[in-house]
Regions:
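Short beta-strand segments at enzyme active-site cores
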Residues: 46-50, 78-81, 113-119, 150-153, ...
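Distinct, well-ordered alpha-helical segments
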Residues: 59-66, 91-96, 127-133, 158-177, ...
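N-terminal pre-domain/capping segments
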Residues: 1-108, 144, 174, 178, ...
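Active-site groove signature of glycoside hydrolases
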Residues: 107-127, 146, 151-156
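A short, acidic, flexible beta-alpha connecting loop/helix-capping segment that sits on the rim
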Residues: 254-269
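Surface-exposed, active-site-proximal loop segments in enzymatic domains
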Residues: 20, 55-62, 83-99, 119-131, ...
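Active-site beta-loop-alpha junctions enriched in small/polar residues
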Residues: 13-15, 50-54, 82-85, 120-122, ...
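Acidic/histidine-rich catalytic cores of soluble enzymes
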Residues: 7, 46-47, 78, 138-234, ...
Length: 291
């Protein structure tokens, strides 16, 4: 059979406009309809939507209209982002559980592919792995009836910051649990050699972007303001893509460009340029035939 087509998902911050993670608001200044139309026109096959924008879009459109907007623009690989503090207790857990339920309800309504989650964001020291594993299993169990995958992102500013730790967290979970592997996080923790060790059953999603070899300020500052369009930085994008394909991955590819330069671009220009520069990275990639 022919190789699987390359289909791209615009992770939320890529087309959100002039907002940023942890800002005063995370809801996009661009209405969801505008983002969806710009994405569809450029060739994207899915969007990510964060919790704050989920709530704002529901208030503005209602869920039936949101579903129709996504369908009309051929956006089929959609994601809900990003759940934090699900391993905590008390008031923090209660807040996380409310967000979880709202993201899963919305994700079910739009047939979302993934619920993205962090693991120990901004926490230092070794993670309480038994607790993480138990809570993750519960997340997967709650998401499974909706057909939603729960995907963990290891990050260099989280307690779960490597491929090995992330695999330890998810490896005994349900079938809908696994990893979202972002090349920026891979690079900043020098995890390139670990990518091929990820079992295909646990490789649920991949995100592409680029960056300079040198970190600008702190890791968090660099991640939030200085990611680059694919091919305009120093990350090992093509070899990373090849390693992911060699594992056997055939799913859609997320693109997460969190960048001052991109967030201040006109929406249609951002949709087009990010799409084109990302697709250009696949030009000389060797793909196995789809099973």
């Amino acid at each position: 059979m022919a190789a699987a087509p390359i289909e791209l998902v615009a992770s939320y911050w890529t087309l959100a406009g002039n907002v940023m993670p942890g800002g005063p608001t995370e809801a996009s200044p661009h209405p969801l309809r505008d983002r969806a139309e710009a994405a569809g026109k450029a060739g994207w096959k899915g969007l990510g939507i964060v919790h704050g924008d989920v709530l704002a879009s529901i208030r503005h459109y209602g869920i039936p209209t949101i579903r129709r907007i996504l369908e009309d623009n051929a956006l089929v690989h959609n994601e809900v982002e990003v759940l934090t503090k699900w391993h905590r207790d008390g008031a923090k857990l209660a807040t996380s559980n409310q967000m979880r339920d709202e993201l899963l309800d919305f994700g079910a309504a739009i047939c979302a592919r993934n619920l993205k989650v962090t693991a120990g964001l901004f926490e230092e020291g070794p993670p309480d792995m038994p607790k993480f594993r138990d809570r993750f299993a519960d997340l997967c169990e709650r998401a499974a009836p909706y057909g939603i995958q729960v995907v963990v992102e290891f990050m260099p500013f989280s307690s779960v910051d490597t491929v090995d730790l992330a695999l330890e967290l998810v490896e005994n979970g349900l079938a809908n649990g696994g990893l979202m592997v972002d090349i920026w996080h891979v690079d900043r923790r020098d995890q390139y050699d670990k990518v091929k060790t990820i079992p295909l059953s646990l490789l649920k999603g991949v995100e592409l972007n680029d960056a300079s070899a040198n970190v600008a300020g702190t890791l968090l500052h660099d991640s939030t303001h200085h990611r680059k369009l694919c091919g305009e930085g120093d990350l090992k994008i093509r070899s990373f893509i090849q390693d992911v394909l060699d594992v056997g991955y055939t799913g859609p590819w997320g693109v997460e460009i969190i960048s001052h330069a991109v967030r201040t671009m006109p929406l249609e220009e951002a949709a087009r340029r990010v799409y084109e520069t990302t697709m250009s990275q696949f030009g000389e990639i060797r793909q196995a035939d789809a099973a």
